[in-house]
From Swiss-Prot:
Primary gene name: psbT
Stated family: Belongs to the PsbT family.
Cellular localization per UniProt: Cellular thylakoid membrane
GO CC terms, sorted: photosystem II reaction center; plasma membrane-derived thylakoid membrane
Protein name: Photosystem II reaction center protein T
InterPro entries, per the entry: PSII_PsbT (IPR001743), PSII_PsbT_sf (IPR037268)
Quaternary structure and partners: PSII is composed of 1 copy each of membrane proteins PsbA, PsbB, PsbC, PsbD, PsbE, PsbF, PsbH, PsbI, PsbJ, PsbK, PsbL, PsbM, PsbT, PsbX, PsbY, Psb30/Ycf12, peripheral proteins PsbO, CyanoQ (PsbQ), PsbU, PsbV and a large number of cofactors. It forms dimeric complexes.
Organism: Prochlorococcus marinus (strain MIT 9301)
């Protein structure tokens, strides 16, 4: 069960970081 908890926390952290960067700095792949 601990492995599942670790994966869940890591996934939540990665998603939070991704959204924070995406909302703070708009994606640049749209306009090359």
């Amino acid at each position: 069960m601990e492995a599942f908890a670790y994966v869940l926390i890591l996934t939540l952290a990665v998603v939070t970081l991704f959204f924070a960067v995406a909302f703070r700095d708009p994606p640049k792949f749209d306009r090359k």
